[in-house]
Amino acid sequence: MVSMLTRIRRQIKRVIEPLAKTLAQLKVSANFITMLGLIFAIVYYFEIMRSNTTLGIIFLVFSALMDAIDGEVARVSKTVSPLGSFLDSTLDRIEDILYISAFIFLGFSSYLVAIAVGLSLTISYIRAKAESLGLKMEGRGIIERGERIIFVFVILLLYIIVSKQVSLYLFYLFMLLTAITVIQRFYAVYSLLRK
């Protein structure tokens, strides 16, 4: 399952690179794209809340696409900046909360959804703290942010085309893999800092 998600992520990247170059040539700001990603995430949340799951999925895809493109646009246009990095990192966390907490409106346990949000944020926090200490965390852990977003997409898709129960099983798997990633990253940082 995870290897399949990773392959999907690679295919998405092949689409993103030429799109990012086009946007950079059109002088579209990376920070504007970052803000657009948050707006789409907010719309996604409210559409799921209103039981418009199909429309919610569409806005989830738009939001995830903006998130994938903004950094590439900044790199291609040579406009990488501390402000852009701050905006991207902060708004990504808000989007993560919106993506996962919307599962409450599908009838999932609010307690489990809260735990899933906490685990997801912990993964990101461990990476941020580790990198502030000079450690490299990219690629550490079984399920990174890109895979987590794809998981959210598939859970919603199964909810529509199969059943709530099947999507709930996938949500449980999502929680398990997220918890494993927290442990993997914690152990990796702990091991590196002990040397």
Curated annotation (Swiss-Prot):
GO terms classed as biological process: phospholipid biosynthetic process
Family matches, as PROSITE patterns: CDP_ALCOHOL_P_TRANSF
Localization, UniProt: Cell membrane
Membrane topology note: Multi-pass membrane protein
Chief localisation class: membrane
Entry annotation: catalytic residues: D92 (proton acceptor)
GO molecular function: magnesium ion binding; phosphotransferase activity, for other substituted phosphate groups
Entry superkingdom: Archaea
InterPro entries tied to this protein: AIP_synthase (IPR044270), archin_ph_syn (IPR054868), CDP-OH_P_trans (IPR000462), CDP-OH_PTrfase_TM_dom (IPR043130), CDP_ALCOHOL_P_TRANSF_CS (IPR048254)
The keyword Membrane is assigned to this record: yes
Annotated function: Catalyzes the formation of archaetidylinositol phosphate (AIP) from CDP-archaeol (CDP-ArOH or CDP-2,3-bis-(O-phytanyl)-sn-glycerol) and 1L-myo-inositol 1-phosphate (IP or 1D-myo-inositol 3-phosphate). AIP is a precursor of archaetidyl-myo-inositol (AI), an ether-type inositol phospholipid ubiquitously distributed in archaea membranes and essential for glycolipid biosynthesis in archaea.
HAMAP family per record: AIP_synthase (MF_02242)
Protein name as catalogued: Archaetidylinositol phosphate synthase
